[in-house]
Amino acid sequence: RLQTREEIKKIQQATKITTVFVTHDQDEAMSISDMIVVMNKGVIQQIGSPQEVYDDPVNLFVAKFLGTPPINVFRGSIKNGRLYLGSDAVLDTPKVHDQEVFVGIRPEGFILQKDGPLACTLNRVEVMGRDISIVSSHPSCENSSIRSIINAESIVDTASSKVCFALKPDKVFLFDKDSEARIEWRRS
């Protein structure tokens, strides 16, 4: 499949043709396309370059559609300008009023930090060469487990049952609990 994707991209570039490629495979969508259209039940959700859509999803459906491993989804709440995942206050969100939200955190949005604000149960560590995948859990997580990708040079205490993280704000997305539309919180 990877070789086929490479051949399709090579033919597109050589012939300079416009191709409409329909797929449910997000890896194909990300790797072959210059522009993608994400649809849900026949309704267009977002149009953009693969990187734009990944970095700037308009809603929770789009955020969950793109990315391998997938985005980690939590139930969260905004209280007095702070984002809480359970009892963990993880980020300042002064521009957002108090409410319940869905929180999406990309796997690369975690920073391993000994006393980081997000305390998780460590399930296992997977060495992937240049990266390490930390598989953990948290009571507020909607996924069966949290997948965080960190640099392999980071040191993970595998003897511990706990792992703590800080979060990269540009990899954290807030979504309305009812409509699942993204809530802007980082921009002025």
Language-model segments: residues:
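Non-catalytic connector elements of ABC transporters
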Residues: 69-71, 82-188
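ABC ATPase nucleotide-binding domains
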Residues: 1-61
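Residues located in well-ordered beta-strands
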Residues: 49, 61, 75-77, 119-123
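C-terminal boundary and immediately downstream tail of ABC-type ATPase nucleotide-binding domains
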Residues: 55-79, 104
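A generic structural signal for ordered secondary structure
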Residues: 30, 46-47, 73, 182-184
